[in-house]
Amino acid sequence: EDLKAQMARLNEEISRIKMQKASAPNIRRTKRHHTKTKTPPEYNKALAAYRSRDYDESILLFQNLALSNPPKSLRDNIAFWIGSNYLALEMFDDAILQYETVLNKYPRGNKVHDSRYMLGVSYSKKGETSRAIEVLEGALKRNPTAEVRGKILAQLNIIQ
């Protein structure tokens, strides 16, 4: 009941923000010049192995990439995907360590919110329901993206 009310409130908030954005004057913003680092082919190969469910191969490829001084912008992603491989293999403690690595070593990385969500999923699958709820509720308080927020709420709905 509480989650439904929370989701309804969040959906209203999203609609309000979209309307504000649509009615805002179109101001041209100056682009910051970021040096876009090219994604190493090894990263794409490791991700492809994960997507084709070859988790052991994917872990090996990501670990090798992690040891080869990858671009800084990918280091959190590498740890995240290693964790996702471990989770798929039901190696929950190893997955938890990887997601915690993302949160502790790369607190400003682009995988922080996803890692909090996956950390909660890992605890849930491990059977530590109260810890999973604690992690997921804590993740909600940290302003995740709408997509991740939806996943968190759905996961909380499943385990509560």
Place the predicted regions along the sequence by residue:
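Acidic, proline-/serine-/threonine-rich low-complexity intrinsically disordered segments
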Residues: 1-61, 68
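Short solvent-exposed coil/turn linkers within tandem alpha-helical repeat scaffolds
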Residues: 68-74, 104-111, 140-150
